[in-house]
């Protein structure tokens, strides 16, 4: 989980409270924020400052700043409750977006009259970097630029240019101008994030005088560097996913609002950002009480939700909940139930022992999986663990497989384009793992045991019409690997587990024709193995022969 270091003095002034160490250690965990440690450090002026390190759950990116933590804590403690209104005024600032294939989405906001000092400046920089990590996947999905608005003049333009088309002084090189290409070669950030620049096209943001504000996702220009004397801030967020870009902007401007900033919208190709329109969800009192095992009345539930900085209307035993724009984690009514539990007080829940006695034992399927695991480890393989979430390109297109929407379960609101569907096979994930480790020495022998999810229209037991199946898959890569090697491994595993099995010739689009076989157990097909097709190897940007198997466990 990400951690943030917060100056205690800064937290106290934002909370408008004097906070003892005991209060911090007792109360913050109750609102879902763990206190890692409290320590002292020397600041730039030589004074001792007390620092609190918090551990933040990944589903609460609004807590990645001291401003967000203070807002949440004021609500939790009952100091400021209910929906916090964020007024957004229209500015005359305009941005023109020209074709930009590599990072097509961009959003802007203007926040004026921010009460800036060293602590505020440090908080802005920290939030920027934490959001890069938490929402931006290390700038791949989104990148944030913060600028001194008074140093430039609109309108602004976001476009792609060639590597030698313009020169500007990047942050850290105040007096040395470079081309975008030179920045990738010489600048620390260019060397680190240059891989995100595709096809030699460099995204750039310029003002009306062609001054460079930013070259996302690499570096800002030194012209708009934010200092403790800056008060009017222009925020740009570029990325590959529209929803993530807008969510990050909402979190950022709401944090600056806590510093007495006034939020102004910016016109980006005819659309105004930020959009802080609240969302609404309806939930019943009975549903909340049933889930929590409590008997709360409407007033108690409304009070708890108001502590979560939401507003609630009560009609016909139903609650209409008004959710702030920065709460991108509220995706389902179960999230509202969690907010009620948290703000009602976890300490008020009473544990009850069940009235029956049971004896625990390992699940039979897990015992079987453990046997598979031990066998593969004995064969000299390394075990890996991948996510169950994947995407159509990895599961089907790179594997040379045809597919339709009936072949996979799709995620309704995916957090990223890489995680849009539930995997139907483990083998593509192993090939991705080999790609990530292609710089390591060969041979590489890996396996994974895990769940795959398939659509089952005949399922009458659940509403989802889906079923989880357990599979094992392995892959071997080195210059001399061949069908005989994977056949030996597969037969060895099958003798240890299934006992009786048959092997027949098999044609599979992911494997070389004539070098693939299917596995039968009591006449039922349970898996396949063979040499991976060269096209598939190239699709995953790998360079050596690969053999693999995939077997159904249950």
Curated annotation (Swiss-Prot):
Q: Which InterPro entries match?
A: aa-tRNA-synth_II/BPL/LPL, B3/B4_tRNA-bd, DNA-bd_dom_put_sf, Phe-tRNA-ligase_IIc_bsu, Phe-tRNA-synth_IIc_bsu_arc_euk, Phe-tRNA_synthase-like_B3/B4, Phe_tRNA_ligase_beta2_arc, PheRS_beta_core
Where in the cell does this protein reside?
Cytoplasm
Q: What is the reaction catalyzed?
A: tRNA(Phe) + L-phenylalanine + ATP = L-phenylalanyl-tRNA(Phe) + AMP + diphosphate + H(+)
- What GO biological process, any one, is recorded here? phenylalanyl-tRNA aminoacylation
In the Enzyme Commission scheme, what number(s) does this protein have?
6.1.1.20
GO cellular component assignments: phenylalanine-tRNA ligase complex
Q: Molecular function (GO) terms listed?
A: ATP binding; magnesium ion binding; phenylalanine-tRNA ligase activity; RNA binding
Q: Give the source's domain of life in one word.
A: Archaea
* Annotated keywords: Aminoacyl-tRNA synthetase, ATP-binding, Cytoplasm, Ligase, Magnesium, Metal-binding, Nucleotide-binding, Protein biosynthesis
Gene3D superfamilies, alphabetized: 3.30.56.10, Bira Bifunctional Protein, Domain 2, Phenylalanyl-trna Synthetase, Chain B, domain 3
> One Pfam family name from the record?
PhetRS_B1
Main localization category: cytoplasm
Domain B5 intervals:
276-351
Cofactor(s) needed for function: Mg(2+)
**Residues that hold Mg(2+) according to the record:** 329, 335, 338-339
Matching entries from PROSITE patterns are given as: B5
Task: Give the similarity note.
Answer: Belongs to the phenylalanyl-tRNA synthetase beta subunit family. Type 2 subfamily.
Q: Which proteins does it associate with, and in what oligomeric form?
A: Tetramer of two alpha and two beta subunits.
Protein name listed in UniProt? Phenylalanine--tRNA ligase beta subunit
Record gene name: pheT
């Amino acid at each position: 989980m990400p951690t943030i270091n917060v100056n205690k003095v800064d937290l106290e002034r934002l909370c408008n409270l004097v906070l003892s160490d005991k209060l911090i250690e007792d109360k913050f965990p109750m609102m879902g924020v763990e206190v890692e440690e409290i320590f002292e450090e020397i600041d730039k002026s030589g004074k001792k400052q007390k620092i609190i390190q918090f551990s933040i759950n990944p589903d609460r990116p609004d807590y990645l700043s001291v401003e967000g933590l203070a807002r949440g804590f004021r609500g939790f403690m009952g100091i400021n409750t209910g929906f916090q209104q964020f007024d957004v005024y229209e500015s005359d600032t305009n941005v023109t977006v020209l074709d930009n294939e590599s990072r097509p989405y961009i959003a802007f906001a203007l926040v004026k009259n921010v009460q800036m000092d060293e602590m505020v400046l440090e908080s802005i920089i920290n939030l920027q970097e934490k959001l890069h990590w938490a929402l931006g996947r290390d700038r791949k999905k989104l990148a944030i630029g913060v600028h001194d608005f008074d140093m430039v003049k609109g309108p602004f333009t976001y476009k792609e240019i060639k590597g030698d088309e313009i020169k500007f002084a990047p942050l850290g090189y105040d007096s040395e101008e470079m081309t975008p290409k030179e920045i990738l070669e010489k600048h620390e950030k260019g060397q680190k994030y240059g891989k995100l620049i595709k096809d030699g096209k460099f995204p750039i943001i310029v003002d009306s005088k062609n001054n460079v504000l930013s070259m996302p996702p690499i570096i800002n220009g030194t012209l708009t560097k934010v200092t403790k004397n800056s008060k009017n801030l222009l925020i740009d967020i570029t990325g590959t996913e529209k929803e993530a870009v807008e969510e990050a902007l909402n979190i950022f401007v709401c944090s600056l609002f806590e510093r007495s900033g006034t939020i102004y919208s910016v016109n980006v190709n005819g659309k105004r950002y930020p959009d802080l329109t609240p969302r609404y969800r309806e939930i019943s009192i009975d549903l909340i009480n049933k889930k929590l095992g409590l008997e709360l009345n409407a007033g108690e539930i409304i009070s708890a939700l108001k502590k979560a900085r939401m507003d609630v209307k009560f009609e016909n035993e139903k609650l209409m909940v008004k959710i702030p724009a920065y709460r991108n984690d509220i995706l389902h009514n179960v999230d509202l139930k969690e907010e009620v539990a948290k703000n009602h007080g976890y300490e008020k829940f009473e544990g009850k022992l069940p009235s029956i006695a049971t004896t625990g034992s390992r699940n039979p399927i897990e015992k079987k999986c453990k046997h598979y695991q031990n066998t593969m480890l004995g064969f000299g393989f390394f075990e890996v663990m991948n996510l169950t979430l994947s995407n159509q390109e990895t599961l089907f297109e790179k594997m040379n497989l045809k597919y339709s929407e009936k072949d996979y379960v799709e995620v309704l609101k995916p957090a990223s384009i890489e995680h849009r569907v539930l995997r139907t096979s483990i083998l593509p994930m192993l090939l991705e793992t080999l790609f990530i480790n292609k710089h390591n020495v060969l041979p590489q022998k890996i396996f994974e045991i895990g769940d795959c999810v398939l659509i089952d229209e005949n399922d009458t037991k659940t509403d989802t019409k889906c079923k989880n199946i357990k599979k094992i898959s392995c892959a071997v890569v080195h210059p001399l690997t061949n069908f005989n090697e994977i056949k030996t491994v597969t037969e060895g595993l099958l003798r240890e587990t299934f006992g009786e099995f048959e092997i027949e010739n098999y044609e599979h689009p992911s494997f070389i024709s004539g070098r693939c076989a299917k596995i039968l157990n009591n006449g039922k097909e349970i898996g396949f193995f063979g040499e991976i097709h060269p096209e598939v190897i190239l699709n995953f940007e790998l360079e050596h022969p690969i053999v693999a198997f995939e077997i159904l466990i249950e």
